[in-house]
Amino acid sequence: MSPTLVVDQENSEEFNTSSFEGPEKLLELWFSAPIKTNLSAGEKANLGLKAVSRNDWDDMLAQAQCKVLSVVNSEEIDAYLLSESSMFVFAHKIILKTCGTTTLLASLPRLLEIASSVGFDRPLRIFYSRKNFLYPERQLAPHTSWEEEVRYLQLFFPSGCSYVVGPTNKNHWHLFSDLADDYSLLEDSLDPEDETLEVLMTDMSPERSLQFYAPSLDVVRSARGDDYVREKNNLSGGHILGSYVADESGVRDLCSTSDKKAVLDAFQFEPIGFSSNMIYKDRYATIHVTPQEHCSYASFETNVSQFQFGRSISETIEKTVKTFGANKFCLTLFQAKGASQEKHFSAKLKSFSSYKREEFIVYDFPGYDLIFASFTAV
């Protein structure tokens, strides 16, 4: 089945401003081992979370104070582009990422209720993470401090552990993680090639930031012709501009797989700000940009493999920071443990030209290793 795009015209037209707090809150819940949904004829697929109705997801997202702009669907993933960032729904897990002053954790009770309705009693693995906020004083409960977030999470996951990674007076990263007692059911099925990279960038160059200020449709017509706009008449204005900006800024190239079969869903906010989701088989990438000079921020997250991209992790990182002109960035890399897989952390995250590495930290978690590193332009 080919991926399909569904645009929510009403919400796409309603949300035309960007949040000033770029750094996202990120929640990832695993409810089971990966479920095969692309079964042959005659076999019945277990759709798990993918069986949840749009109304239920809308209800949950309302608790987080965000709405759906559009959805790209495939057999493996439903990728929701939101008014504030993104949501990815697999049969067995969900990833919810929201920026600004959204109240992501306030949606957790409803999320667990929805998961229970499709047969998942509790998550086997929980991740909640975020970079340090630019404007922490603007956040709403339960996000007014990391301590408050941890207290709230422990109401649901009392055995969870809290980590602060990196120097607290510079760029740093928060993580809350928990495992169910029967986590081994999941660990035995982990893909040894599973890697999730997140690059969190600040202090973008003015030249690159300007690429994410909304052009007019007249500018797009002048640059690409009337046919370019006419072909996209089923899209909202934000999606038409998003497609154009993705081409012009290098975002589409950054998200392209080696076989050119990835599907990109992009939205340009007016007057400023950009978001996109990409899906490829059972993999995804997501980008969010807040380009204002005084609080510029861009993020890139993906679990697309090096083989699928046709480039190394280091090459992907270099391409990412060049695309957004970041003067500072930190990154996290979650990598599944594999008996036959050699780990060469320093080789994967080599020194990057024009950047000085300030921090390099490795954590050993059950089933995964985590790398955190931060860099500043020189």
UniProtKB/Swiss-Prot annotation:
Pathway annotation from the record: Amine and polyamine biosynthesis; S-adenosylmethioninamine biosynthesis; S-adenosylmethioninamine from S-adenosyl-L-methionine: step 1/1
Keywords attached to this entry: Autocatalytic cleavage, Decarboxylase, Lyase, Polyamine biosynthesis, Pyruvate, S-adenosyl-L-methionine, Schiff base, Spermidine biosynthesis, Zymogen
Cofactor comment: Binds 1 pyruvoyl group covalently per subunit.
Named cofactor requirement(s): pyruvate
UniProt key word S-adenosyl-L-methionine: yes
Superkingdom assignment: Eukaryota
Catalytic activity reported: S-adenosyl-L-methionine + H(+) = S-adenosyl 3-(methylsulfanyl)propylamine + CO2
PANTHER family per UniProt: S-ADENOSYLMETHIONINE DECARBOXYLASE, S-ADENOSYLMETHIONINE DECARBOXYLASE PROENZYME
Protein name per its UniProtKB record: S-adenosylmethionine decarboxylase proenzyme
Organism whose genome encodes this protein: Schizosaccharomyces pombe (strain 972 / ATCC 24843)
